[in-house]
């Protein structure tokens, strides 16, 4: 499986505070581990298919990671809140 962090993901992470950036990084690492090894999610992590190949992962209620999962390719697209994810999906 191949993982790619899109420039839009990197740009979106810059808007967070340092402690939130660390939480986003930890969640992304957990997702990579879970998807590459076909492991179950740990408690406290939500994973939801949104539309088409777009999925959302979250740990807690505030911060979400939007990624596109197409076969063997996982592209991390955006980190943000619920409204950021909805706004992105409306335009893509």
Please give the residue ranges for each predicted region:
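Generic recognition of well-ordered alpha-helical segments
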Residues: 11, 26-30
């Amino acid at each position: 499986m191949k993982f790619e962090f899109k420039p839009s993901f990197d740009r979106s992470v810059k808007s967070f505070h340092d402690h939130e950036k660390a939480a986003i990084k930890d969640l992304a690492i957990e997702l990579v581990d879970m998807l590459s090894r076909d492991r179950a999610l740990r408690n406290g992590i939500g994973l939801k298919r949104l539309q088409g190949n777009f999925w959302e992962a979250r740990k807690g209620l505030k911060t979400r990671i939007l990624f596109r999962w197409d076969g063997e390719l996982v592209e991390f697209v955006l980190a943000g809140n619920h409204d950021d994810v909805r706004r992105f999906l409306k335009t893509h």
